[in-house]
């Protein structure tokens, strides 16, 4: 019998939890190790940098390792520590194909209660993460972080006491600061100060509802970035992300519409506005095989200046060979038209296709 999409989603979470290995479980303390090794073979072509030939690569695609320790105090109270590492070196550096240096992607502690919610402190995802419904494995065409940061150095609160509903709020703190002289310090920047162009602080609030075949999510964020050497001059980003979707459970089909709007207020220069809309779908073609895709239209404009319009499409198919083995093929195409006063119209195109394999552990 064909599974419903809701059952697939529940099963996916269960499988994710099952992939982690419990290495210690005693007196209310549980320690899990898990992760995945991901490889992708791809062909890509872009006119952005006047590239004329296709480039092929075999590289890392988001391989990761995590350790999670949870201690239950009783009466629904718990504490949790989480650490996740990633590979960060670019393929163009040292011929590493993205399997170079290892860094901490997320590192945080959580204090919570099943009835009252939880407080999370550290480098973690924010409530803005997972707002949009579009599915992708590698070539996602939605740039959510241009609207609201989806992770960072944060203090956050999340409430999950109502079935299907998640409420959350985050306060973002500066994460990237200048080092001392001789330690990658930029000219004219003060050691210990926030780097120019990086997050100074910010706030986010959001709500996510996913039940009764309805998906509705929305988040708002106000983020301040350091603009120049003066601590008083900031670049402020106000953004909204939202999604609305419906599951046709009997058909194994999810249809959704993602959207976003943002306005960037710059010090002494023209402000910038952007928005996007993106219809998408996810369909269970057969057991353990899914088809997904989405289209995006995005427009960016500077007051009385440059205007950019981007159209992009993504399509993919994934198949679970085993509960811990996933393979997929995915492709994306994007065309960007930039209009600037006195310079005419410039068109840029990008296309990529890849075949990937993920082994979970």
Swiss-Prot record:
Asked if the keyword Protein biosynthesis belongs to this entry, the reply reads: no
The membrane-topology field of this record reads: Multi-pass membrane protein
Give the record's GO biological process terms: monoatomic ion transport
Which stretch is the leader sequence? 1-20
Its subunit composition reads: Homotrimer.
Query: PANTHER family per the record?
Result: OUTER MEMBRANE PORIN F-RELATED, PROTEIN YDDL-RELATED
User: What functional role does this protein have?
Assistant: Forms pores that allow passive diffusion of small molecules across the outer membrane.
Q: What is this protein called?
A: Outer membrane protein P2
The source organism is Haemophilus influenzae
């Amino acid at each position: 019998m064909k599974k419903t999409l809701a059952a697939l989603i529940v099963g996916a979470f269960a499988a994710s939890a099952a992939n982690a290995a419990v290495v210690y479980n005693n007196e209310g303390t549980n320690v899990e190790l898990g992760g995945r090794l991901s490889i992708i073979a791809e062909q890509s072509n872009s006119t952005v940098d006047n590239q004329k030939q296709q480039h092929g690569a075999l590289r890392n695609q988001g391989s990761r390792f995590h350790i999670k320790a949870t201690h239950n105090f009783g009466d629904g109270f718990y504490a949790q520590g989480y650490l996740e590492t990633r590979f960060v070196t670019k393929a163009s550096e040292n011929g590493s194909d993205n399997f170079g240096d290892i860094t901490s992607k997320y590192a945080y502690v959580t204090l919570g209660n099943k009835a009252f919610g939880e407080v999370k402190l550290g480098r973690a995802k924010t409530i803005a993460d997972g707002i949009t419904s579009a599915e992708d494995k590698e070539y996602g065409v939605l740039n959510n972080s241009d609207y609201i940061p989806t992770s960072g150095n944060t203090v956050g609160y999340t409430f999950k006491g109502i079935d299907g509903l998640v409420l959350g709020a985050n306060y973002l703190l500066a994460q990237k600061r200048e080092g001392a002289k001789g330690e990658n310090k930029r000219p004219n920047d003060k050691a210990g100060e926030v780097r120019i162009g990086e997050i100074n602080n910010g706030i986010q609030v959001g709500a996510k509802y996913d039940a009764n075949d309805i998906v509705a999510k929305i988040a708002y964020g106000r983020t301040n970035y350091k603009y120049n050497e003066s601590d008083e001059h900031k670049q402020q980003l106000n953004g909204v992300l939202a999604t609305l979707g419906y599951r046709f459970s009997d058909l194994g089909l999810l249809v959704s519409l993602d959207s976003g709007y943002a306005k960037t207020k710059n010090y002494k220069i023209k402000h910038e506005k952007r928005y996007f809309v993106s219809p998408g779908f996810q369909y269970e073609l057969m057991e353990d095989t899914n088809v997904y895709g989405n289209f995006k239209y995005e427009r960016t404009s500077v007051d009385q200046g440059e205007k950019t319009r981007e159209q992009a499409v993504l399509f993919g198919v994934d198949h679970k060979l085993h509960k811990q083995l996933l393979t997929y093929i995915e492709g994306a195409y994007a065309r960007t038209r930039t209009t600037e006063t006195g310079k005419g119209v410039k068109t840029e195109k990008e296309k990529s296709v890849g075949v990937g394999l993920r082994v979970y552990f």
